[in-house]
């Protein structure tokens, strides 16, 4: 089924107008438009209390602040609020403050929207420091849990290796940022997580290892039922695929298996429980953004999918948005989706680090 492609807003320039949005497939009644363009390498997003949209980047080294200066509901002001950073992919907003994750640290910009309004040079403090400096899988997705703690992943610095912690973990920081506990271990590279709105449990995606073939291993959707659980890396992948280098003598029963095997090399990024009211009930489930494969003979991913849950069991996993990948032609792609950010009206923003835009996905009715 195909939804609608809506006209772009005032913040959209010629580059976005050239994107083939008509190639995107959405369920009937849904629409997609470019919300903000010219945000190269757009990654994680966070929304301020006054409506400022903060966007981190990876290779660009910048953080953007996007605002609606005239109150018409359309972004029209873009500011590069930080530059020259080391892969500032992750951003999170809490109680007026913006948190920006680089590879080895997390900055805190107190009262950020007031700072931006003042026009003065932005001040910040280091909230977290001293994390590993390895760049491979070192970029971060960060977020605050319902417990008020900041969760920060530290990816494995390799395709496959057995390095000491905090590598291959998700860390939960104390409220002052000075200490942490290992909340999940055996996590190769998570770039997205969210908390179940009912149970409060952390669900996260994990990117599987490479160089084992086109079909092995599958990437994972996982659920943390007890702090400190081990999810298998580097000994097992997708629950039961024994690693040829590190799996000998290990028992898969000693590790937590995934809730869902997502597919080989699909590269899951954001995991988002939809809690808005504007989508029909059939679409108020768990959305997973698949960034797309890079080392598979036929590409896979490059889409947003929806996992339908019954309790903690996934009973269906189906496409929600696809069309960025031209599988039927030359296996080329024109976009790679990354992160989802809900808006107050129930629509979802979706960043794209390849096209350098942020889309808005909304339900407009049948």
Question: Where on the chain are the PLM-derived regions?
Answer:
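Beta-propeller domain segments
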Residues: 17-26, 139, 156-160, 173-178, ...
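Surface loop/turn motifs at the tips and blade-to-blade linkers of beta-strand repeat domains
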Residues: 34-39, 79-84, 127-134, 182-186, ...
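Beta-rich catalytic cores
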Residues: 41, 49, 77, 84-87, ...
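Conserved beta-propeller blade signature
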Residues: 52-56, 97-100, 149-153, 201-205, ...
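Acidic, glycine-anchored loop motifs typical of Ca2+
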Residues: 71-77, 116
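Asp-box/WD-like beta-propeller blade repeats and closely related beta-sheet repeat scaffolds
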Residues: 92, 104-145, 153-156, 184
């Amino acid at each position: 089924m195909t939804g609608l492609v809506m006209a772009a807003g005032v913040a959209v320039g010629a580059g976005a107008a050239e994107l083939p949005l008509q190639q995107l497939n959405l369920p009937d009644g849904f629409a997609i438009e470019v919300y903000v363009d010219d945000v190269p390498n757009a990654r994680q997003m966070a929304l301020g209390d006054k409506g400022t949209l903060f966007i981190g980047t990876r290779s660009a080294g910048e953080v953007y602040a996007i605002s609606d200066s005239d109150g018409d509901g359309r972004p029209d002001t873009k500011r590069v609020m930080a530059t020259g950073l080391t892969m500032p992919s992750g951003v999170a907003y809490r109680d007026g403050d913006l948190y920006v994750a680089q590879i080895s640290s997390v900055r805190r910009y107190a009262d950020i929207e007031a700072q931006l309004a003042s026009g003065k040079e932005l001040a910040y403090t280091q909230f977290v420091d001293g994390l590993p400096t390895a760049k491979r899988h070192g970029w971060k997705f960060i977020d605050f849990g319902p417990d008020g703690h900041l969760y920060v992943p530290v990816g494995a610095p390799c395709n496959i290796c057995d390095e000491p912690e905090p590598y291959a973990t998700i860390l939960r920081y104390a409220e002052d940022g000075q200490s942490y506990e290992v909340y999940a271990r055996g996590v190769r590279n998570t770039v997205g997580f969210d908390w179940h709105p009912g149970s409060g449990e952390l669900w996260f995606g994990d990117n599987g290892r490479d160089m084992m073939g086109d079909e092995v291993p599958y990437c994972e959707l996982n659920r943390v039922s007890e702090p400190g659980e081990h999810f298998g890396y580097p000994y097992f992948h997708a629950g039961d695929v024994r690693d040829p280098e590190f799996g000998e003598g290990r028992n898969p029963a000693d590790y937590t298996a995934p809730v869902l095997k997502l597919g080989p090399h699909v590269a899951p990024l954001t995991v988002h429980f939809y809690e808005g009211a504007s989508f029909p009930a059939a679409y108020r489930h768990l959305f997973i953004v698949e960034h797309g494969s890079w080392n598979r003979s036929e590409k896979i991913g490059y889409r947003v999918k929806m996992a339908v849950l019954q309790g903690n069991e996934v009973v269906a996993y189906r496409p929600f948005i696809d069309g960025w990948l031209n599988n039927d032609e030359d296996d080329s792609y024109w976009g790679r989706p990354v992160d989802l950010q809900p808006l107050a009206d129930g629509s979802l923003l979706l960043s794209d680090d390849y096209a350098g835009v942020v889309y808005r996905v909304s339900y407009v009715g049948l």
